[in-house]
Amino acid sequence: RALPPHCRRQRQMCIRDSSDTSPEISDIVDLYQDELMLFERYHIEDQIKKALDRKVWLPSGGHLIIDRTEALTVIDVNTGKFVGKNSLEETVYENNLEAAEEIARQLRLRDIGGSIVIDFIDMESTKKQQSLLNRFKQELAKDKTRTQVFEISRLGLVEMTRKNVAAGLVESFSEECEKCNGRGLIIN
């Protein structure tokens, strides 16, 4: 029951640190037997913490800020340390392309669903804007979960929806702060 459906469909091998495995899935579940704890060996806790962080670094030095609210998820793209080798417009375009790929990955990884607004870095060229949107749609096509992407708004925002399939990663690994009631700040 707890085995992810994609593991059953794709016949991937799963590792378990307990020997009590249901007979119907025993052919795709290996028992992990090592002195080093499973989470330690594969740095799973570090990976989960990284996947829950609101700041996601891009390989070039730019970064994403991912904020979840009750109404929607907002993703802000920033150049950060990325200065590029070409014109400012080309640097921004390259950063946005890299961000488009990573945003699609983060949506899958974090299982983010519902309404999503993305604030890519502003670009003057409508040709580059359309190219970015096409690239983003290509990256989203790798996702088995249904998505819908709308045109870039007059404010330069990309609005999209992604079907809610289950509780996302943040919801699965967190609880509301008792001190601030989930606001993220305490009023003095």
Predicted regions and their residues:
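Structural motif
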Residues: 3-6, 56, 107-108
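Conserved short loop/turn motifs at secondary-structure junctions
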Residues: 8-12, 33-37, 120-124
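Conserved glycine-centered short motifs in functionally critical loops
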Residues: 58-188
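Predominantly extracellular/luminal regions of secreted and cell-surface proteins
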Residues: 20-21
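Short, solvent-exposed polar/charged micro-motifs at secondary-structure junctions
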Residues: 16, 37-43, 158-162
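Interdomain boundary/hinge elements
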Residues: 8-9, 24-35, 146-154, 187-188
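Single conserved hydrophobic/aromatic residue that forms the stacking wall/gate
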Residues: 1-15
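A contiguous, basic/glycine-rich beta-loop/short-helix subdomain that forms a polymer-engagement track
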Residues: 26-64
